[in-house]
């Protein structure tokens, strides 16, 4: 009886991970997570709860064909490697929840989701059901207090290093939110989700929040220099074409004019100066 129970437990554990083509799949307790190579030295992570992962993309281009190194290490651990980046997927015995850690080619930790469980019932992937089949989703990562974070678009704030900042993930008249950053640890991260939300770059944890979404979706790339990381990002989302010649030159730009006389004064001054 005891032997049969051990065999049954082993069969259940073995169902956590599977290799599906060029992707590593995790399934447990209604959650499905898919990790796959997405351009050079990069991995894309998608996940859902009680549904199938949706195909398609918001910003990422279709990846070029490439082979990933996938290893099912044991019942509770699997890895997937693409060039300079490796993801280690581990099932934690308490609660059987997944934790993903990203390493560079030297085996150094770049980024790691938080550990699950404990008295606070913490979860790296926290789904909160909403009406209509969507979720409010929070994804949490461990934070290196010495890490420096750069990017995220244009915000009305004075800090170049975003460590310690809280940012709204939404476009406004005074801000352009681009949820991608470059880390001083040697990686780039794209929150591939169009939902309005928030990001908190704390010194203890980094938390991404999507207020309404169907699935988890983020992309991580590794590089030896910021320029290499930016190059991977450009390859993943598409490179900006050269502006046509007729669009080059001086642009007269002002947020607003209060009346017609202000506009005419500008026009008169241009005419005066030739």
State where each predicted segment sits.
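N-terminal accessory segment at the very beginning of proteins
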Residues: 1-247, 252-255, 262-268
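Short, intrinsically disordered, charge-balanced linker/junction segments flanking boundaries
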Residues: 271-274
């Amino acid at each position: 009886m005891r032997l049969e129970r051990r065999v049954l437990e082993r069969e259940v554990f073995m169902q956590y991970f599977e290799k599906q083509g060029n992707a590593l799949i995790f399934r447990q307790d209604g959650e499905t997570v898919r990790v796959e190579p997405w351009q050079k030295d990069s991995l894309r992570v998608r996940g859902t709860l009680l549904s199938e992962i949706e195909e398609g993309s918001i910003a990422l281009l279709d990846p070029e064909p490439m082979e990933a190194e996938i290893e099912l290490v044991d019942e509770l651990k699997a890895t997937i490697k693409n060039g300079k980046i490796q993801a280690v997927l581990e099932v934690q015995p308490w609660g059987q929840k997944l934790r993903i850690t990203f390493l560079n080619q030297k085996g150094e930790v770049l980024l790691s989701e938080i550990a699950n469980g404990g008295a606070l019932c913490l979860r790296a992937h926290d789904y909160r059901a909403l009406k209509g089949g969507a979720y409010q989703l929070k994804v949490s990562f461990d934070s290196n207090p010495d890490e420096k974070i750069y990017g995220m678009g244009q915000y009305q704030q004075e800090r170049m290093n975003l460590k310690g900042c809280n940012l709204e993930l939404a476009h406004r008249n005074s801000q352009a939110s681009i949820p991608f950053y470059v880390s001083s640890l040697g990686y780039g991260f794209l929150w591939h989700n169009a939902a309005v939300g928030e990001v908190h770059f704390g010194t203890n944890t980094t938390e991404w929040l999507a207020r309404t979404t169907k699935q988890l979706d983020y992309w991580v790339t590794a590089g030896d220099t910021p320029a290499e990381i930016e190059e991977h990002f450009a390859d993943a989302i598409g490179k900006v074409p050269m502006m046509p010649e007729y669009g080059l030159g001086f642009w007269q730009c002002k947020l607003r004019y209060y009346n017609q006389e202000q506009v005419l004064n500008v026009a008169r001054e241009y005419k005066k100066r030739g």
